[in-house]
Amino acid sequence: MKVIFLKDVKGKGKKGEIKNVADGYANNFLFKQGLAIEATPANLKALEAQKQKEQRQAAEELANAKKLKEQLEKLTVEIAAKAGEGGRLFGSITSKQIAEALQAQHGLKLDKRKIELNDAIRALGYTNVPVKLHPEVSATLKVHVTEQK
């Protein structure tokens, strides 16, 4: 019997795959557990529509990420911090502070986990901070740390 897997089944198939399995296995296990449905023409058409919808969403997310990349690369985030002699900061600037400053200054909401700051910023001046917007799209955000008076 041909079935469409709704979830990954170890040793049998992955989600969205169409496979031939034994009738008893399909009826007594896969269907009852909600792991698969029968591969009827209507179900195949629904699966195809679902795949197309997912592809459209993925393409839209990629386009949005590229658009956001262009915006971010034009911006500079200004952060004022207390500093000592030689431009060393008291404390440091973290990805959370960068995300909050970006929201406050430019109205762009960005998750702090997307800001890939290896080490916190501990000096005054300009720093280029990598931002991972999408698995395929990365941007560079300029952060300008100034001395707080």
From Swiss-Prot:
GO molecular function, one term: rRNA binding
Name of encoding gene: rplI
Record-level GO BP terms: translation
First and last residue of the signal peptide: none
A Pfam short name: Ribosomal_L9_N
Protein role: Binds to the 23S rRNA.
Native source species: Geobacillus thermodenitrificans (strain NG80-2)
Entry's family note: Belongs to the bacterial ribosomal protein bL9 family.
SUPFAM superfamilies attached to this UniProt entry: L9 N-domain-like, Ribosomal protein L9 C-domain
InterPro entries assigned: Ribosomal_bL9 (IPR000244), Ribosomal_bL9/RNase_H1_N (IPR009027), Ribosomal_bL9_bac/chp (IPR020594), Ribosomal_bL9_C (IPR020069), Ribosomal_bL9_C_sf (IPR036791), Ribosomal_bL9_N (IPR020070), Ribosomal_bL9_N_sf (IPR036935)
Cellular component, GO, one term: ribosome
Record-given protein name: Large ribosomal subunit protein bL9
Keywords assigned: Ribonucleoprotein, Ribosomal protein, RNA-binding, rRNA-binding
Domain of life: Bacteria
Transmembrane segments: none
